[in-house]
């Protein structure tokens, strides 16, 4: 019998996600990856629902548009720069509300600007999310008692994540983005 005749014609069953340098399963101590590795080793493929797949894709490709009204917009620009690079988390800027999933309201919202904010929000496709950034957007901030200031953008549009601070740091906004992704993963698409 030749050596080639003793080899099976079918490849071996996969053993999960294997690190080629060590030969061990990747993150074998993580419960999430243990479940994935066990399913891969058992069946050779993964089974999921379409809703889980859509939620996974949505959290990894959030397109945001700015509604920068004051000094918080500077920190919002900072989060896109190389030091923080929010795009590595799948959070990329867009100029048009029709291409955006997330609106970041940063700064003091006045009564005259409120209809414009609502109009831009209505142009965004569903599902749409709003991050309120800074004390002025959250509750009026320093100008809370002014006759011309809306006391929080949540009186005009529904807000999903509040980022506190005056102005909040870029790290705080980045944390707010990660919280939004966690919220999307938790709630899915149907409940929203």
UniProtKB/Swiss-Prot annotation:
One of its GO terms (cellular component) is plasma membrane. It comes from the Bacteria. Binds 1 [4Fe-4S] cluster. Pfam families: Oxidored_q6. InterPro entries: NADH_UbQ_OxRdtase-like_20kDa, NADH_UQ_OxRdtase_20Kd_su. Gene3D superfamilies: 3.40.50.12280. Keywords: 4Fe-4S, Cell inner membrane, Cell membrane, Iron, Iron-sulfur, Membrane, Metal-binding, NAD, Quinone, Translocase, Transport, Ubiquinone. Its EC number is 7.1.1.-. [4Fe-4S] cluster binds at residues 71-72, 136, 166. Its main location: membrane. Disulfide bonds: none annotated. GO terms for biological process: aerobic respiration; electron transport coupled proton transport. It is an enzyme of class 7 (translocase). Its cofactor is [4Fe-4S] cluster. It is a peripheral membrane protein. It is found in: Cell inner membrane. NDH-1 shuttles electrons from NADH, via FMN and iron-sulfur (Fe-S) centers, to quinones in the respiratory chain. Couples the redox reaction to proton translocation (for every two electrons transferred, four hydrogen ions are translocated across the cytoplasmic membrane), and thus conserves the redox energy in a proton gradient. NDH-1 is composed of 14 different subunits. Subunits NuoB, C, D, E, F, and G constitute the peripheral sector of the complex. Belongs to the complex I 20 kDa subunit family. This is NADH-quinone oxidoreductase subunit B. The gene is nuoB.
